Amino acid sequence: MPKLKTRRSAAKRFKRSGSGKFMRRKAYKNHLLEHKGPDRKSRLSKKCVVSEQDAENVRAMMPYS
């Protein structure tokens, strides 16, 4: 049976944590940052966990992670 391919776009966006959950960056932190407060920008800089509903799709896109 041939190897499964990893979707490279997903591999660049998601990382697996030590406990097996997928981590992702938060949105709204690329541009138009002048009017956003420092607390908000700090909060948006942190990583967060992918929801359980989406984790199934991410797992299918990255079979070897």
UniProtKB/Swiss-Prot annotation:
GO MF annotations in UniProt: structural constituent of ribosome
Question: Signal peptide: which range, if any?
Answer: none
The record lists its disulfide bonds as none
This protein's GO cellular component annotations are: cytosolic large ribosomal subunit
Classification via Gene3D superfamilies:
4.10.410.60
Q: A GO biological process this protein is involved in?
A: translation
InterPro entries from the xrefs? Answer: Ribosomal_bL35, Ribosomal_bL35-like, Ribosomal_bL35_CS, Ribosomal_bL35_sf
* Cited PANTHER family: 54S RIBOSOMAL PROTEIN BL35M, LARGE RIBOSOMAL SUBUNIT PROTEIN BL35M
Q: Which family does it belong to?
A: Belongs to the bacterial ribosomal protein bL35 family.
Q: What protein am I looking at?
A: Large ribosomal subunit protein bL35
Q: Which organism is it from?
A: Acaryochloris marina (strain MBIC 11017)
Taxonomically, what lineage is the organism? Answer: Bacteria, Bacillati, Cyanobacteriota, Cyanophyceae, Acaryochloridales
